[in-house]
Amino acid sequence: MADLIMGIDPGTLVCGYAFIRVENRYQIQPHSFGKIKLSQKQALSHRYRQLFTEISTILQREAPKAVVLETQYVHKNPQSTIKLGMARGVLLLAASLQDISVFEYAPNTAKKAAVGKGNASKQQVQLMVSKLLNIQDLLADDNEDIADAFALAMCHAHLAPYQDLKKSLL
């Protein structure tokens, strides 16, 4: 049976998400993808509530085995880092309330899994993911967040077996 993995690229204005199906550890197929658009005119608290509500609905409908997020990283603007961290918290809570396992990877780890180099640009990730999964729609300028979400899900598909091995050795 195939495992369904959800990658999420969090944001305070756009949150990209993508689902992949993984069979026999190596066969990866795209399942579905999209983005949650949040209005800049809304107060931050309302955006977080909308993000929580929409992601909870998606999680309930799709019931993935795992949710994958980027680890927190520090922006040049400390306020942006804090706001993004709160969005990540909302996403972690939504998955946790539905008893879905959450995994986190550094952005450079996800880029390396998708492109082969950890310092790849967003456009390089977008191009490679669209080619690997044969999804031409990802090449649109406003789909970088979705491509990043696919890269995170693919990263977990590749690294999860090694995490299980690591746990068994400890």
From Swiss-Prot:
<keyword id="KW-0378">Hydrolase</keyword>
<dbReference type="Pfam" id="PF02075">
    <property type="entry name" value="RuvC"/>
</dbReference>
<dbReference type="GO" id="GO:0000287">
    <property type="term" value="F:magnesium ion binding"/>
</dbReference>
<feature type="active site">
    <location>
        <position position="70"/>
    </location>
</feature>
<dbReference type="GO" id="GO:0006281">
    <property type="term" value="P:DNA repair"/>
</dbReference>
<dbReference type="InterPro" id="IPR020563">
    <property type="entry name" value="X-over_junc_endoDNase_Mg_BS"/>
</dbReference>
<feature type="active site">
    <location>
        <position position="145"/>
    </location>
</feature>
<keyword id="KW-0963">Cytoplasm</keyword>
<feature type="binding site">
    <location>
        <position position="9"/>
    </location>
    <ligand>
        <name>Mg(2+) 1</name>
    </ligand>
</feature>
<keyword id="KW-0255">Endonuclease</keyword>
<dbReference type="GO" id="GO:0005737">
    <property type="term" value="C:cytoplasm"/>
</dbReference>
<dbReference type="GO" id="GO:0006310">
    <property type="term" value="P:DNA recombination"/>
</dbReference>
<keyword id="KW-0238">DNA-binding</keyword>
<keyword id="KW-0233">DNA recombination</keyword>
<keyword id="KW-0234">DNA repair</keyword>
<comment type="function">
    <text>The RuvA-RuvB-RuvC complex processes Holliday junction (HJ) DNA during genetic recombination and DNA repair. Endonuclease that resolves HJ intermediates. Cleaves cruciform DNA by making single-stranded nicks across the HJ at symmetrical positions within the homologous arms, yielding a 5'-phosphate and a 3'-hydroxyl group; requires a central core of homology in the junction. The consensus cleavage sequence is 5'-(A/T)TT(C/G)-3'. Cleavage occurs on the 3'-side of the TT dinucleotide at the point of strand exchange.</text>
</comment>
<dbReference type="GO" id="GO:0008821">
    <property type="term" value="F:crossover junction DNA endonuclease activity"/>
</dbReference>
<dbReference type="InterPro" id="IPR012337">
    <property type="entry name" value="RNaseH-like_sf"/>
</dbReference>
<feature type="binding site">
    <location>
        <position position="145"/>
    </location>
    <ligand>
        <name>Mg(2+) 1</name>
    </ligand>
</feature>
<protein>
    <recommendedName>
        <fullName>Crossover junction endodeoxyribonuclease RuvC</fullName>
        <ecNumber>3.1.21.10</ecNumber>
    </recommendedName>
</protein>
<keyword id="KW-0460">Magnesium</keyword>
<dbReference type="GO" id="GO:0048476">
    <property type="term" value="C:Holliday junction resolvase complex"/>
</dbReference>
<dbReference type="InterPro" id="IPR036397">
    <property type="entry name" value="RNaseH_sf"/>
</dbReference>
<comment type="similarity">
    <text>Belongs to the RuvC family.</text>
</comment>
<keyword id="KW-0479">Metal-binding</keyword>
<comment type="subunit">
    <text>Homodimer which binds Holliday junction (HJ) DNA. The HJ becomes 2-fold symmetrical on binding to RuvC with unstacked arms; it has a different conformation from HJ DNA in complex with RuvA. In the full resolvosome a probable DNA-RuvA(4)-RuvB(12)-RuvC(2) complex forms which resolves the HJ.</text>
</comment>
<keyword id="KW-0540">Nuclease</keyword>
<feature type="binding site">
    <location>
        <position position="70"/>
    </location>
    <ligand>
        <name>Mg(2+) 2</name>
    </ligand>
</feature>
<dbReference type="InterPro" id="IPR002176">
    <property type="entry name" value="X-over_junc_endoDNase_RuvC"/>
</dbReference>
<keyword id="KW-0227">DNA damage</keyword>
<feature type="active site">
    <location>
        <position position="9"/>
    </location>
</feature>
<dbReference type="GO" id="GO:0003677">
    <property type="term" value="F:DNA binding"/>
</dbReference>
